[in-house]
């Protein structure tokens, strides 16, 4: 699978600051499937007519933008059924999904997992995705703080080649209320440490838990807040021991 980070910023990136800018977090898979996205990422897509499907993690405006749907229509839109019925854009074919079940998207096999996030819609279920294709797989986990228990148990069935995590709050910034629905870089370090090595010594009833991340699997940070991170070069330097701090336009092969 070929991935491009169309956007890597949180909601507080509104306009370019000092020549550097992050569009709202969005990912392009094999040139045809998007995860989230606002109209601000259109310039990076190249050929909007090539987009066949969009997967939505949740309905926040920095992730779901009807203007983007209008620009790439006709398109299939995959959203959790708790809010999928509210998407009414001409040319958008809405395909609801449930959590903890697999579904096919343009030749990819996708599983939606419940995430620790919330929106103005109290009834909405927000999600992360496991995406599989060509014998490879990755985990896309933004927005959301930590991992819910159901999500963790679902991940135990996976052997992931890569992961992308919400890292809204920077390494050297004090935690605030956002840790209840977003990660700090330190939180991601703890999560990834367990995904790589689930067992810290023997346990009488939980033996045999294998790593979720394959050896050498790379971890990418996205959804970086403008007000809660230093310059990109500084982020890249402080995270180089375990992560890749993604920036808009980064392309990777999984």
Predicted regions and their residues:
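Cap/insert and terminal regions of metallo-dependent hydrolase folds
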Residues: 147-250
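Short amphipathic alpha-helix with an adjacent loop that forms part of the alpha/beta core around
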Residues: 44-48, 69, 102-107, 151-156, ...
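Divalent metal-coordination and catalytic microenvironments
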Residues: 3, 27, 58, 110, ...
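Conserved beta-strand hairpin/beta-sheet module of binuclear metal-dependent hydrolase folds
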Residues: 1-47, 123-142
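Active-site metal-binding motif and surrounding structural segment of the metallo-beta-lactamase
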Residues: 37-80, 159-163, 168
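Structural motif
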Residues: 32-33, 53, 108, 136-140, ...
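Active-site metal-binding loops of divalent metal-dependent hydrolases
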Residues: 8-10, 32, 37-40, 58-59, ...
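Metallo-beta-lactamase
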Residues: 79-135, 242-252
């Amino acid at each position: 699978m070929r991935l491009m980070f169309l956007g890597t910023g949180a909601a507080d990136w509104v306009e370019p600051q000092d020549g550097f800018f992050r569009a709202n977090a969005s990912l392009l898979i094999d040139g045809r499937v998007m995860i989230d996205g606002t109209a601000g990422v259109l310039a990076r897509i190249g050929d909007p007519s090539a987009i066949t499907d969009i997967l939505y993690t949740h309905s926040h405006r920095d992730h779901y933008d009807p203007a983007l749907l209008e620009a790439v229509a006709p398109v299939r839109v995959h959203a959790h059924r708790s809010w999928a019925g509210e998407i009414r854009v001409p040319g958008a074919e809405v395909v609801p999904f449930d959590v903890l079940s697999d579904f096919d998207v343009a030749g990819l096999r996708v599983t939606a997992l419940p995430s620790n996030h919330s929106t103005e819609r109290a009834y909405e279920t927000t999600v992360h995705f496991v995406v599989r294709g060509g014998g490879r797989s990755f985990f896309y986990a933004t927005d959301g703080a930590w991992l819910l228990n159901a999500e963790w148990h679902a991940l135990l069935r996976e052997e992931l080649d890569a992961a992308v995590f919400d890292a809204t709050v920077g390494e050297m910034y004090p935690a605030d209320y956002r840790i209840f629905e977003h990660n700090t870089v330190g939180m991601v370090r703890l999560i990834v440490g367990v995904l790589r090595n689930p067992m810290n010594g023997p346990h009488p009833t939980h033996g045999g838990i294998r790593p979720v991340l394959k050896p050498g699997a790379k971890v990418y940070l996205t959804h970086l807040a403008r007000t809660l991170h230093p310059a990109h070069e500084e982020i890249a330097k402080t995270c180089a021991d375990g992560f890749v701090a993604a920036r808009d336009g980064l392309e990777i092969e999984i």
